[in-house]
Design a protein with these regions (language model features):
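Residues at secondary-structure transition points
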Residues: 30-41, 69, 73, 77, ...
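N-terminal beta-alpha supersecondary unit
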Residues: 1-64, 177
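Surface "functional belts" at beta-alpha junctions
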Residues: 22, 89-178, 206, 211-212
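Phosphate-handling active-site elements
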Residues: 50-55, 84-93, 195
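DPxDG-like acidic metal-binding loop motif
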Residues: 59-89
């Protein structure tokens, strides 16, 4: 199967293409260009380099976050429109899990969610990712307690270098940016297990801080 992967959950636009287990290409663009422009431009450029066209795609996978609210809406909308126009299946996957799939072993993706909070997940990655800590938004200080449960863990994500110095048992991934091929790979794994998603049910994963976590943060600020 040829799978197109799209992620716009961060300031990086990531587009990747795989055919079964083979990565055909990865394109990344980080900067001020609007996701809506960069996604379409990058997809057009990709298919100029291959002997097959966009109409030969079998599945579209898209990162559903958590991450940038605006970015997620753009990426998911583009994926839905393309799937409808091409009459192919579409599937949404965790951007955090996909980001961690560039490394093996215990890997955590950490994204700055502001005000002392992070979006985070933990996986054990080999041929397929095993999720040990589901996507969540929580105070970074609280997440550090979660990470301490493991001997050594790799920290991935664009914001990893902001937090690595505060985690004693961690090392920084060399693969900081999202890869669209990881989105495509995770999409294919989920598709084989669960089949396609109903496009109407494909929505961003807007994680919101819970009341308990908000109180934890408030107590921390009060004690400073």
């Amino acid at each position: 199967m040829k799978v197109l992967g799209i992620d716009t959950s961060t300031k990086t636009t990531a587009i990747g293409l795989i055919e079964d287990d083979e990565v055909l290409c990865d394109y990344n663009l980080t900067g001020r260009v609007a996701h809506s422009e960069s996604v379409t431009d990058m997809i057009h450029e990709i298919f100029e380099k291959f002997e097959f066209g966009l109409e030969d795609i079998d599945l579209i996978a898209v990162g559903i976050g958590p991450g940038s609210f605006t970015g997620l809406r753009i990426g998911i909308t583009i994926a839905k429109v393309m799937a409808f126009a091409l009459d192919v299946d579409v599937i949404g996957v965790s951007s955090l899990v996909a980001n961690a799939m560039s490394d093996y072993g215990l890997v955590s993706t950490i994204v700055d969610a502001r005000r002392g909070n992070v979006y985070a997940s933990i996986i054990k990655n080999s041929d397929e990712p095993e999720v040990l800590f589901e996507d969540e938004i929580l105070p970074f200080e609280q997440f550090k307690d979660e990470v301490k449960k493991y001997d050594v863990i790799t920290i991935a994500g664009l914001d990893g270098d902001k937090f690595i110095g505060e985690i004693d048992n961690a090392k920084l991934s060399k693969n900081k940016s999202m890869r669209g091929s990881n989105i495509a790979r995770l999409g294919l794994i989920d598709y084989k297990k669960n089949g396609p998603m109903n496009a109407f049910n494909l929505v961003p994963n807007y994680l919101k801080i819970s009341q308990a976590e908000a109180q934890y943060e408030k107590n921390n600020e009060t004690s400073k």
